[in-house]
Structures are given as structure tokens and as C-alpha cells.
């Protein structure tokens, strides 16, 4: 901190006036490049945030790595699944994550379904458009995937605000 004292990050955040954290969760990050942002890591960080007096937002990427406008990769273990199967996986992942976090006594204030989803999520199934234009059924598929996450989120955290994340919106 400014006095030169070492502090845990959530404690320091609270001391300097922050009041919330946004924690991303990936499906299987070890399949890519790191061991962070899986359910166990997010649960530990959410508990530390709660103990520091911070509100918690959970940001679901539905990917094994960063999901952004140029990269909305379906998790490796979910590749090749049908839309119906993906909806089940989305709901299971949301339930498992939020159940783990809330089991630690953490109240989740906000839940973000997808990250920077202006062109959908979990491509190609949830993709909205490509260089040739809008994809047939793109919005319908995206909304179904989003609602699978939304419904699961409200099941575990009925008081939380649930939202999409649209960059450039």
C-alpha cells in the first residue's frame, strides 16, 4: 500500500476505496495456457473478496481461454456438441461455479453470461455473423445459449443481477 505495507490484493482494493471485484471463469484453462480462472480459483478469489468486504461479480467466458470479439472458442471438451447439448453444458457449468462460490457463503451480486458477445459466443454454434453477413439462426442459437446460462444463474442466485456483456454497446 502507500505506506509500504504488504497487503493481500482484495484487502488493498478495499482500503483504497474499491467495493467490488469481477472474476472471470473459464471452463478448462489448463487445456490452454494457465492454471487460473477455473471454478476452484474463482471460488477462492470470491471468498477472499467477501472476507475483504467486496461485492462479487462472476464473468462466464464459456471458453478455455479469453473470449473476446476476435475469439469466442467453444471449450475443447464441448466441441462438436449439438445446440441442445451445449445448452446443458452451459447450465451445468453455471450451476457448478455458482454452487461452489455460494457454498463458501459468498453472495454473488452480478453474473455476466458471456464475455464481449457482440458476435455471439461459443463459435460456431452461437456465432451471429461472419464476413458474408448474418448467419441463419444465429440470434436464435445465441439467445438459447444465453438463456441456458441465465436460467441456471437465477436458479442458484435468484437475487443476483444477470446480464450479457456486449463490447461497443
Predicted regions and their residues:
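Alpha-helical scaffolding within the catalytic cores
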Residues: 3-11, 96-97, 168-169
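Aromatic-lined substrate-binding rim segments of carbohydrate-active enzymes
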Residues: 5-70, 75, 134-163
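Active-site cleft segment of glycoside hydrolase catalytic domains centered on the general acid/base Glu
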Residues: 39-40, 68-169
Amino acid at each position: 500500500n502507500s505506506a509500504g505495507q504488504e497487503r493481500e490484493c482484495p484487502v488493498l482494493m478495499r482500503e483504497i476505496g474499491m467495493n467490488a471485484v469481477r472474476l472471470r471463469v473459464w471452463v478448462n484453462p489448463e487445456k490452454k495456457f494457465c492454471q487460473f480462472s477455473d471454478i476452484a480459483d474463482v471460488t477462492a478469489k470470491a471468498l477472499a473478496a467477501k472476507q475483504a468486504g467486496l461485492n462479487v461479480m462472476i464473468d462466464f467466458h464459456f471458453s478455455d481461454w479469453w473470449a473476446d470479439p476476435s475469439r469466442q472458442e467453444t471449450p475443447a471438451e464441448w466441441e462438436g456438441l449439438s445446440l441442445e447439448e451445449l445448452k446443458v453444458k452451459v447450465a451445468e457449468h453455471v450451476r457448478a461455479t455458482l454452487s461452489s462460490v455460494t457454498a463458501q457463503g459468498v453472495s454473488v451480486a452480478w453474473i455476466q453470461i458471456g464475455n464481449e458477445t457482440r458476435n455471439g459466443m461459443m463459435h460456431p454454434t452461437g456465432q451471429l455473423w461472419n464476413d458474408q453477413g448474418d448467419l441463419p439462426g444465429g440470434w436464435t442459437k445465441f439467445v438459447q445459449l444465453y438463456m441456458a446460462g441465465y436460467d441456471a444463474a437465477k436458479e442458484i442466485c435468484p437475487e443476483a443481477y444477470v446480464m450479457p456483456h456486449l463490447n461497443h454497446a
